[in-house]
């Protein structure tokens, strides 16, 4: 723990704490927190550069001689995208039991592209270790959501046991004055600052809550590849060194001993090898000459071994599965593959719990604006359903649904199936289809009844006509 100007503290994981007895951040404490976050931003930006493929080896001093290859094994990009796709590749289902409230919720989510923003928040969490979502009102007074990276934003919590949000800070550098400028969001007001000067005027905060939430996958606020950065750097170095050696020995040296090739007597060998497949000398001593290429040291097996070991350790320590591994290409059983994915699934389950808490806090802010749903306390009734993005065995999923039929409710069964995105809508569709079938059956039944009545009427008419004809014949005979 580190103290900042006496009132503020910084805990492990770059967590900022401030006294709950204060109404707002002291300007000096605000600047101290901001300077410290700018310092931490160097690590955040370094992680982003690694994700983008700009690794440290590319910035090292150039060699004065020999090959100087700089190879980058961009495993951070693979690890982040694989894990984020596994976690949010299937958008989580966020629903309410009340039909009208749920429709309003889904409408707000769709209007704000919430699932896309949530995926980006998850991605930033994997890269930086944390990300922020904040709520605001646009020019039409509609409730909207945006996200911010920790490179230019941070959250300050109070020093109580609950660690409630005290303030959310966004900042940027003013291009004209060159001063750091930003906004501080409190639960009851919003203040603007430029440099060390905080404006006296306040903007109203209609939410009565700090309008931002921090997302993270673990309490330590570590990114998904933070623990393997040194291994990745070493892999880059080994691959580059191997490429240098291959290029160096491609320029093979020819050793010629005991052979006089100085034809013009200038003391230099005259060996024209271009286009020739032989070396000829009329000297009788040439029979004992030694002509061969200098062979390179055979360190290839050792290099391949350390490369394989580094790659294996990177996936093992990061706990993200290597989907290109032979284990996923063979005919392994489903249980065996589940064990291969177990570390990543455990990590995703922990991240799911953290995200569920953060999402509930976020929707509490959204619902407090009284625009999305009528019940401001509906955030307590939200249902979150995260599904890990795994290949779907349709036959197995169908069998599971069939086995659950009659054992649990349809909604519960549908929630446990990856074939169905929205259980409530699926139930509504099934009920609608069933009602349509009933209506069609009734129509067919009514049509059949009418047809039978018409047929009976025709038969009756025929009988009446026949009776009349018979009566007329009897009269004529009389």
Predicted regions and their residues:
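Extended, helix-rich architectural segments
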Residues: 1-144, 470-478
